[in-house]
Amino acid sequence: MIVLVGLPGAGKSTLAEALARRLPGARVLDKDKVRHVLFDPCDYTSAERDVVFAAMLDAARYHLGRDRIVVFDGLTFSRRSQVAAAEAVAHDAGAFVAVLVCDVPLEVAIARVEAADDHLAANRDAQVVRRVAAEMEEPSGDYLTLDMTSDPERLVDQAMAYVEELAGE
């Protein structure tokens, strides 16, 4: 399981897609797509968010039980408890967990969010980025921090090396 931690606009989706291309059979679980399937129109409430997160954990449990790698995308994992919930699912399935912290300056995340007018999450704006940044907790346990302003290919190589190390490949 790969858990991408970071602000909206950090580049988690770009990284998730690149990792999935290099990991045969990997499943990207995208929060925004799941939310739109379950709730359209979306109201972006905490209750809705909780249902979506639970559905993603269930989907992860299903795929991990079939020896597939799961990449969580679209979630900020701003709370340690969220990371812990994903880790528990992976551990129950006997799967590895690679926590990748997608680090980007606040100003860069805001600029990216404001420039992206085609994102599925209609609530993404500078205010949301600032709120998530204020709530962000450093994950406990092992993780790899990636500078999401650096070369994209280098980032994917770094992430893959970490994933392969944890997966025992």
Predicted regions and their residues:
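Walker A (P-loop) ATP-phosphate-binding motif of ABC ATPase nucleotide-binding domains
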Residues: 1
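Hydrophobic anchor at the beta1->P-loop junction of P-loop NTPases
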Residues: 4
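P-loop (Walker A) phosphate-binding loop of NTP-binding proteins
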Residues: 7
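Conserved substrate/cofactor phosphate-moiety recognition/catalytic segment
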Residues: 10-66
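Conserved nucleotide-binding/hydrolysis micro-motifs of P-loop NTPases
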Residues: 33-35, 78, 103-108, 151-152
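Glycine-rich phosphate-binding loop used to anchor ATP phosphates in small-molecule kinases
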Residues: 48-97
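Conserved phosphate-donor/acceptor-positioning beta-strand/loop module used by diverse small-molecule
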Residues: 91-113, 146
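Small-molecule kinase domains that catalyze NTP-dependent phosphoryl transfer to phosphate-bearing small molecules
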Residues: 115-158, 166-169
